[in-house]
Amino acid sequence: MKRSISIFITCLLITLLTMGGMIASPASAAGTKTPVAKNGQLSIKGTQLVNRDGKAVQLKGISSHGLQWYGEYVNKDSLKWLRDDWGITVFRAAMYTADGGYIDNPSVKNKVKEAVEAAKELGIYVIIDWHILNDGNPNQNKEKAKEFFKEMSSLYGNTPNVIYEIANEPNGDVNWKRDIKPYAEEVISVIRKNDPDNIIIVGTGTWSQDVNDAADDQLKDANVMYALHFYAGTHGQFLRDKANYALSKGAPIFVTEWGTSDASGNGGVFLDQSREWLKYLDSKTISWVNWNLSDKQESSSALKPGASKTGGWRLSDLSASGTFVRENILGTKDSTKDIPETPSKDKPTQENGISVQYRAGDGSMNSNQIRPQLQIKNNGNTTVDLKDVTARYWYKAKNKGQNFDCDYAQIGCGNVTHKFVTLHKPKQGADTYLELGFKNGTLAPGASTGNIQLRLHNDDWSNYAQSGDYSFFKSNTFKTTKKITLYDQGKLIWGTEPN
């Protein structure tokens, strides 16, 4: 595929510098700053995570699954893909202590080191997670924790990328004052001998839900935050009330783990509840990390079974949870805007020379059905693999359940796939898009898919107000439009997304 000359020259210069033994600052191919280059050393101001200039920062990213089980997904290639395609600004390396983790197999720490080194090169933040779970009392392996964090802080004490999470989810017969706080004071003391200022996150009771207890008896370290964990299908307003209480007491919160599923990790997904949580976190500028990057066959996993371990994932490789999380990282304004998913929306690359034509099957301004008809044409000189191509029709669903029918397709309705995606933040003329994909087939130069006739309706068969929909316009004949966007493996190649 063709790339711009400027990008080619930039890549060539980076290659030559690397061959010459010189190290360039981490940056994207377009020369924009990475999250760490932009924000630098993090600290706490009141309840807010701030950058070196004292400006509020909201980090967003994803956590590994247990490194002893799914460590193959943690490598520079996968993290680079997550940075560039998902827009993550933080990655969490979840090193279980029990269940075949560090206590039984200390070599698993090498995967943590690999994650940190990759994050340093890529300019993203990284959380070193001492992932207690079945060993619910952090004091059970306190000396091992001190030994581990002594090593990590001695290695990375001068690295602004690093965040320490010293007790994932204390649970069982533990409480803040008697068990967790004394443990944290000892481990923090070990870290601070080597690292005076990087952020330290401390888990709270009841699987990191009792931030209210920590808020009433806070640690003295100036750069400590308190972990809040939730799973959207299980935890609701009662937990947000605890968070509000903690914030009112001046306790900074970091959501180092949350899932779209229920608390088991394998029930759901609960997207409406997830949206409610993300709206809340955005309103408070609370950083978050989603669980989890793996292909485990459970609903909280971001990837479908068998997905590549080194990135390069197509949208079809993502689970419902992964699709939602990626969309919501890309669809919000934070430090990730320096690492865009796609070229500028105003000037997308026309890599394959493909375009889309549209006509309205129902031109009524108010109708209980939306009936877009479209065809995709290959205007280029090379054959296009339709499995890599997706199209998005942007419109307003107004939080109603959506239904899809393919009435006719020259390439066969059985070859057309679809999904509805609700935007975390509505855009001009759209709170939802219909994404079409194709199971197989190719387009030779000059060829077209032919007519694809679609029909959408609300669950309750209520009317749509099409006149304000971004992708809609009234036309009885096929016309080229840039308000229906096309993507190659998730990368925008035709059209303009709504603002």
Curated annotation (Swiss-Prot):
Domain (CBM3) ranges: 350-499
Signal sequence, renumbered to the chain: 1-29
Pfam families associated with the record: CBM_3, Cellulase
Catalyzed reactions: Endohydrolysis of (1->4)-beta-D-glucosidic linkages in cellulose, lichenin and cereal beta-D-glucans
Keyword Cell membrane among UniProt keywords: no
GO-annotated molecular function: cellulase activity; cellulose binding; glucan exo-1,3-beta-glucosidase activity
EC supergroup of this enzyme: hydrolase
A biological process term (GO) from this entry: cellulose catabolic process
PANTHER family per the UniProt record, alphabetical: ENDO-BETA-1,4-GLUCANASE A, GLYCOSIDE HYDROLASE FAMILY 5 DOMAIN-CONTAINING PROTEIN
UniProt protein name: Endoglucanase
UniProt organism field: Bacillus subtilis (strain 168)
